[in-house]
């Protein structure tokens, strides 16, 4: 049954995250992995667009936050790479398929496999059980968490980057297409941290001032002792409240930790911030989840 039980809904409301084991089958995960392998095999990224992805604030502003390749990726399928995988000329130092940090941000719109997963009847039933009336899909990503050097994701709130008024209207759905364990960089959460508001916002520069972003506010020094790990077996789905604090460590194991994730916004009575880096476009307005 895809709908949440009253006890599951209560736990999500209390913690700001919830694991649903076995939400997707192993076969569905294989289909996603096979399709992403095909997309990677066809990858052709010009030298000047080879952007290393980071969640560290200073590196964000120096790399993807100030490049049009990132800022214009909201309605496209684009590739972002781990740190240290290019030489000074932009050539790969490791096999290209092992260099990718993530693919974003519109797999849900442009690829039939990921569109089918995103809009699957069980996802729609799950989201309905959370009470969302007019959910729209704002972005999607396939995350690789490569073995041996898959980068850490520093503590953050999704609403820092996907801000709405009022708050509390963004929901992440994170699907483990491979086992996500302590050894290979599973997610960590601070339970209940979604009730304290947003401490930092990433703001896009006005269009007439050129591409770029800046941050308003600062990330608190989160107490590491407050984080709890959330290992997830392949096929598990994690619901993530837009304001819950979460992170993941670097993957130093021999195994990747692949996942498909997408974010929804409750469009009813909600204003999507015009300052967000990601904006709907004429080519791709935020598509409704319910079809």
Swiss-Prot record:
Chain residues that bind Fe cation:
156, 158, 246
- Cofactor(s), by name: Fe cation
Matching entries from Gene3D superfamilies are given as: q2cbj1_9rhob like domain
The cross-references to InterPro entries, in alphabetical order and at most eight, read: Phytyl_CoA_dOase-like
Q: Which domain of life is it from?
A: Eukaryota
Where is 2-oxoglutarate annotated to bind? 102, 141, 156-158, 174, 248, 257
Instruction: Write out the entry's keywords from A to Z.
Output: Dioxygenase, Iron, Metal-binding, Oxidoreductase, Phosphoprotein
GO molecular function annotations of the record: 2-oxoglutarate-dependent dioxygenase activity; metal ion binding
Q: Which SUPFAM superfamilies match?
A: Clavaminate synthase-like
Which residues does the record list as Phosphothreonine (modified residue)? 55
The record's annotation in Pfam families points to: PhyH (PF05721)
Q: What EC number(s) is this enzyme filed under?
A: 1.14.11.-
What is this protein's function per UniProt?
2-oxoglutarate(2OG)-dependent dioxygenase that catalyzes the conversion of 2-oxoglutarate to succinate and CO(2) in an iron-dependent manner. However, does not couple 2OG turnover to the hydroxylation of acyl-coenzyme A derivatives, implying that it is not directly involved in phytanoyl coenzyme-A metabolism. Does not show detectable activity towards fatty acid CoA thioesters.
- Name this polypeptide is given: Phytanoyl-CoA dioxygenase domain-containing protein 1
Species per Swiss-Prot/TrEMBL record: Rattus norvegicus
């Amino acid at each position: 049954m895809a709908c949440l039980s009253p006890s599951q809904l209560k736990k999500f409301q209390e913690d700001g995250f919830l694991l649903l084991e076995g939400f997707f089958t192993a076969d569905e995960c294989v289909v996603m992995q096979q399709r992403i392998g095909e997309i990677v095999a066809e990858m052709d990224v010009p030298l000047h667009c080879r952007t290393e992805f980071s969640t560290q604030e200073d590196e964000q502003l120096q790399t993807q936050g100030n490049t049009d390749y990132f800022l214009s990726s909201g309605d496209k399928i684009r590739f972002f790479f781990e740190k240290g995988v290019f030489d000074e000329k932009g050539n790969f130092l490791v096999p290209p398929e092992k260099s990718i940090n993530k693919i974003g941000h519109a797999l849900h719109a442009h690829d039939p496999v990921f569109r089918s997963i995103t809009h699957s009847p069980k996802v729609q039933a799950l989201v309905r059980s959370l009470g969302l009336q007019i959910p729209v899909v704002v972005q999607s990503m396939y995350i690789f968490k490569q073995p041996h050097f898959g980068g850490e994701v520093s503590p953050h709130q999704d609403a820092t980057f996907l801000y709405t008024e009022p708050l509390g209207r963004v929901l992440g759905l994170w699907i483990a297409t491979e086992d996500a364990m302590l050894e290979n960089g599973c997610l960590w959460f601070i339970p209940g941290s979604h009730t304290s508001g947003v401490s930092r916002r990433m703001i896009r520069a006005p269009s007439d001032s050129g591409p770029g972003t800046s941050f308003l506010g600062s990330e608190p020094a989160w107490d590491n002792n407050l984080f709890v790990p959330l290992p997830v077996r392949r096929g598990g789905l994690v619901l993530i409240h837009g304001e819950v604090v979460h992170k993941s460590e670097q993957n130093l194991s021999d195994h990747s930790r692949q996942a498909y994730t997408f974010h929804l916004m409750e469009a009813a009575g909600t204003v999507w911030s015009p300052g967000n880096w990601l904006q709907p476009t004429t080519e791709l307005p935020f598509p409704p989840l319910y079809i």
